[in-house]
A protein has these predicted regions:
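N-terminal export leaders
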Residues: 1-4
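Cleavable N-terminal signal peptides
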Residues: 7-8, 18
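Serine-esterase "nucleophile elbow" of acetyl-processing enzymes
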Residues: 19-69, 79-87
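Alpha-helical cap/lid subdomain in secreted, periplasmic
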Residues: 22, 49, 56-59, 75-215
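Acidic-and-aromatic substrate-binding clefts and catalytic sites of carbohydrate-active enzymes
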Residues: 70-74
Protein backbone atom coordinates (compact mmCIF):
# COMPACT_ATOMS: atom_id res chain seq x y z
CA UNK A 1 0.00 0.00 0.00
CA UNK A 2 2.84 2.35 0.88
CA UNK A 3 4.66 1.45 -2.32
CA UNK A 4 1.55 2.22 -4.35
CA UNK A 5 1.12 5.62 -2.67
CA UNK A 6 4.78 6.46 -3.25
CA UNK A 7 4.54 5.48 -6.90
CA UNK A 8 1.42 7.58 -7.33
CA UNK A 9 3.10 10.59 -5.71
CA UNK A 10 6.17 10.17 -7.87
CA UNK A 11 4.03 10.00 -10.98
CA UNK A 12 2.41 13.24 -10.00
CA UNK A 13 5.81 14.93 -9.79
CA UNK A 14 7.15 13.74 -13.11
CA UNK A 15 8.37 16.44 -15.51
CA UNK A 16 5.74 17.36 -18.01
CA UNK A 17 2.83 16.55 -15.72
CA UNK A 18 -0.03 18.91 -16.51
CA UNK A 19 -1.07 20.95 -13.50
CA UNK A 20 -4.22 22.97 -13.19
CA UNK A 21 -3.64 26.65 -13.91
CA UNK A 22 -4.23 29.06 -11.09
CA UNK A 23 -7.26 31.26 -11.70
CA UNK A 24 -6.54 34.88 -12.63
CA UNK A 25 -6.41 37.53 -9.93
CA UNK A 26 -9.72 39.36 -9.88
CA UNK A 27 -9.46 43.15 -9.67
CA UNK A 28 -12.15 45.82 -9.86
CA UNK A 29 -11.54 49.33 -11.19
CA UNK A 30 -13.99 51.48 -9.22
CA UNK A 31 -14.30 54.96 -10.64
CA UNK A 32 -16.07 57.56 -12.73
CA UNK A 33 -16.02 58.31 -16.47
CA UNK A 34 -12.21 58.22 -16.46
CA UNK A 35 -12.48 54.54 -15.60
CA UNK A 36 -15.69 53.81 -17.50
CA UNK A 37 -14.23 55.01 -20.81
CA UNK A 38 -16.43 57.96 -21.70
CA UNK A 39 -17.28 57.89 -25.44
CA UNK A 40 -14.87 55.02 -26.00
CA UNK A 41 -15.52 51.38 -26.97
CA UNK A 42 -15.25 48.96 -24.05
CA UNK A 43 -11.94 47.58 -25.27
CA UNK A 44 -10.40 51.08 -25.20
CA UNK A 45 -11.48 51.85 -21.62
CA UNK A 46 -8.87 52.02 -18.85
CA UNK A 47 -9.58 48.61 -17.22
CA UNK A 48 -9.40 46.75 -20.54
CA UNK A 49 -6.22 48.49 -21.69
CA UNK A 50 -4.56 47.96 -18.30
CA UNK A 51 -5.54 44.29 -18.29
CA UNK A 52 -3.97 43.77 -21.71
CA UNK A 53 -0.80 45.57 -20.63
CA UNK A 54 -0.48 43.40 -17.54
CA UNK A 55 -1.13 40.19 -19.46
CA UNK A 56 1.54 41.20 -21.96
CA UNK A 57 3.97 41.31 -19.03
CA UNK A 58 2.95 37.86 -17.84
CA UNK A 59 0.40 38.65 -15.13
CA UNK A 60 -2.76 36.55 -14.83
CA UNK A 61 -5.41 39.15 -14.04
CA UNK A 62 -8.97 40.09 -14.83
CA UNK A 63 -10.05 43.69 -14.29
CA UNK A 64 -13.76 44.43 -14.06
CA UNK A 65 -14.89 47.87 -15.18
CA UNK A 66 -16.93 49.42 -12.35
CA UNK A 67 -16.72 52.96 -13.68
CA UNK A 68 -19.86 55.10 -13.85
CA UNK A 69 -19.77 58.36 -15.78
CA UNK A 70 -20.60 61.36 -13.63
CA UNK A 71 -20.07 59.48 -10.39
CA UNK A 72 -18.74 61.19 -7.28
CA UNK A 73 -16.95 59.72 -4.30
CA UNK A 74 -20.28 59.63 -2.44
CA UNK A 75 -21.92 57.88 -5.38
CA UNK A 76 -19.15 55.31 -5.42
CA UNK A 77 -19.69 54.69 -1.73
CA UNK A 78 -23.42 54.23 -2.26
CA UNK A 79 -22.87 51.46 -4.83
CA UNK A 80 -19.78 49.93 -3.27
CA UNK A 81 -21.24 46.58 -2.24
CA UNK A 82 -22.65 45.67 -5.64
CA UNK A 83 -19.85 47.25 -7.65
CA UNK A 84 -17.22 45.25 -5.76
CA UNK A 85 -18.62 41.72 -5.46
CA UNK A 86 -17.45 38.96 -3.17
CA UNK A 87 -14.37 37.27 -4.56
CA UNK A 88 -12.70 40.55 -5.55
CA UNK A 89 -9.01 40.40 -4.64
CA UNK A 90 -8.05 44.04 -5.16
CA UNK A 91 -9.55 47.42 -6.09
CA UNK A 92 -8.15 50.31 -8.10
CA UNK A 93 -10.00 53.27 -6.62
CA UNK A 94 -10.32 56.27 -8.95
CA UNK A 95 -12.91 58.76 -7.69
CA UNK A 96 -13.00 62.45 -6.84
CA UNK A 97 -12.68 64.21 -10.19
CA UNK A 98 -16.39 65.04 -10.34
CA UNK A 99 -16.34 66.18 -6.73
CA UNK A 100 -13.62 68.62 -7.68
CA UNK A 101 -15.37 69.83 -10.84
CA UNK A 102 -18.51 70.52 -8.80
CA UNK A 103 -16.57 72.32 -6.09
CA UNK A 104 -17.62 69.81 -3.45
CA UNK A 105 -16.17 70.48 0.00
CA UNK A 106 -12.95 68.42 0.12
CA UNK A 107 -13.95 67.23 3.59
CA UNK A 108 -16.95 65.47 2.03
CA UNK A 109 -14.77 63.82 -0.61
CA UNK A 110 -12.20 62.77 1.97
CA UNK A 111 -14.83 61.21 4.22
CA UNK A 112 -16.46 59.26 1.37
CA UNK A 113 -13.16 57.94 0.03
CA UNK A 114 -11.97 56.97 3.49
CA UNK A 115 -15.22 55.14 4.17
CA UNK A 116 -14.80 53.19 0.92
CA UNK A 117 -11.24 52.28 1.91
CA UNK A 118 -12.23 51.22 5.43
CA UNK A 119 -15.14 49.11 4.20
CA UNK A 120 -12.92 47.36 1.67
CA UNK A 121 -10.28 46.74 4.34
CA UNK A 122 -12.97 45.19 6.52
CA UNK A 123 -13.64 42.81 3.62
CA UNK A 124 -9.88 42.17 3.32
CA UNK A 125 -9.75 43.73 -0.15
CA UNK A 126 -6.55 45.73 -0.76
CA UNK A 127 -6.79 49.12 -2.47
CA UNK A 128 -4.62 50.98 -4.95
CA UNK A 129 -5.55 54.65 -4.66
CA UNK A 130 -5.45 56.71 -7.86
CA UNK A 131 -5.18 60.39 -7.01
CA UNK A 132 -6.59 63.51 -8.60
CA UNK A 133 -5.47 67.14 -8.55
CA UNK A 134 -7.75 70.17 -8.38
CA UNK A 135 -8.01 72.55 -11.33
CA UNK A 136 -6.07 75.82 -10.89
CA UNK A 137 -9.18 77.98 -11.28
CA UNK A 138 -10.62 76.66 -8.01
CA UNK A 139 -8.23 78.76 -5.95
CA UNK A 140 -5.25 78.06 -3.77
CA UNK A 141 -7.16 77.15 -0.60
CA UNK A 142 -9.41 74.64 -2.35
CA UNK A 143 -6.51 73.11 -4.26
CA UNK A 144 -4.44 72.71 -1.10
CA UNK A 145 -7.26 70.94 0.74
CA UNK A 146 -8.29 68.76 -2.20
CA UNK A 147 -4.82 67.76 -3.35
CA UNK A 148 -3.91 66.60 0.17
CA UNK A 149 -6.73 64.04 0.28
CA UNK A 150 -5.01 61.24 -1.61
CA UNK A 151 -1.51 61.27 -0.08
CA UNK A 152 -3.05 61.69 3.37
CA UNK A 153 -5.33 58.67 2.92
CA UNK A 154 -2.54 56.60 1.43
CA UNK A 155 -0.31 57.30 4.44
CA UNK A 156 -3.07 56.74 6.96
CA UNK A 157 -4.11 53.39 5.49
CA UNK A 158 -0.79 52.17 4.05
CA UNK A 159 -2.07 52.15 0.47
CA UNK A 160 -0.22 52.01 -2.81
CA UNK A 161 -0.73 55.47 -4.33
CA UNK A 162 -0.59 56.72 -7.90
CA UNK A 163 -0.57 60.48 -7.23
CA UNK A 164 -2.31 61.80 -10.36
CA UNK A 165 -4.42 59.55 -12.57
CA UNK A 166 -4.31 61.97 -15.51
CA UNK A 167 -0.58 62.57 -15.43
CA UNK A 168 0.57 63.17 -19.00
CA UNK A 169 -3.02 63.60 -20.19
CA UNK A 170 -4.51 66.62 -18.42
CA UNK A 171 -3.94 69.74 -20.47
CA UNK A 172 -2.59 67.78 -23.43
CA UNK A 173 -4.83 68.30 -26.47
CA UNK A 174 -3.37 65.28 -28.24
CA UNK A 175 -4.57 63.04 -25.41
CA UNK A 176 -7.96 64.54 -24.54
CA UNK A 177 -11.32 64.76 -26.24
CA UNK A 178 -12.83 67.99 -27.47
CA UNK A 179 -14.22 68.66 -23.98
CA UNK A 180 -10.65 69.03 -22.74
CA UNK A 181 -11.33 66.64 -19.87
CA UNK A 182 -11.73 63.03 -20.94
CA UNK A 183 -8.90 60.95 -22.38
CA UNK A 184 -9.02 59.76 -25.95
CA UNK A 185 -8.02 56.16 -26.69
CA UNK A 186 -4.46 57.46 -27.02
CA UNK A 187 -4.88 59.28 -23.71
CA UNK A 188 -6.00 56.08 -21.98
CA UNK A 189 -2.89 54.36 -23.28
CA UNK A 190 -0.85 57.17 -21.72
CA UNK A 191 -2.67 56.73 -18.41
CA UNK A 192 -1.91 53.01 -18.46
CA UNK A 193 1.73 53.63 -19.36
CA UNK A 194 2.04 55.95 -16.37
CA UNK A 195 0.22 53.86 -13.80
CA UNK A 196 1.58 50.46 -14.84
CA UNK A 197 4.65 50.40 -12.54
CA UNK A 198 2.43 51.36 -9.59
CA UNK A 199 -0.03 48.59 -10.44
CA UNK A 200 2.86 46.13 -10.57
CA UNK A 201 3.90 47.25 -7.10
CA UNK A 202 0.31 46.69 -5.96
CA UNK A 203 0.24 43.21 -7.49
CA UNK A 204 3.50 42.45 -5.71
CA UNK A 205 1.81 43.26 -2.42
CA UNK A 206 -0.88 40.76 -3.37
CA UNK A 207 1.74 38.09 -3.98
CA UNK A 208 1.20 38.18 -7.72
CA UNK A 209 4.24 37.71 -9.94
CA UNK A 210 4.44 37.66 -13.73
CA UNK A 211 4.71 34.23 -15.29
CA UNK A 212 7.95 33.48 -17.06
CA UNK A 213 7.76 32.89 -20.79
CA UNK A 214 7.44 29.23 -21.60
CA UNK A 215 5.56 28.37 -18.42
Amino acid sequence: MLLFAAATLAAGLRPGTVQAEEPPLKLVALGDSLTAGYRLPAEAAFPAVLERALKAKGYRVEIANAGVSGDTSTGGLDRLDWSVPDGTQGVILELGANDMLRGTDPAVTRKALETIIVRLKERRIPVLLAGMLAAPNLGTEYRTRFDAIYPDLARAHDLVLYPFFLDGVAGQRANTMDDGLHPTAKGVERVVEGILPTVETFLGRLGQKPEQKGQ
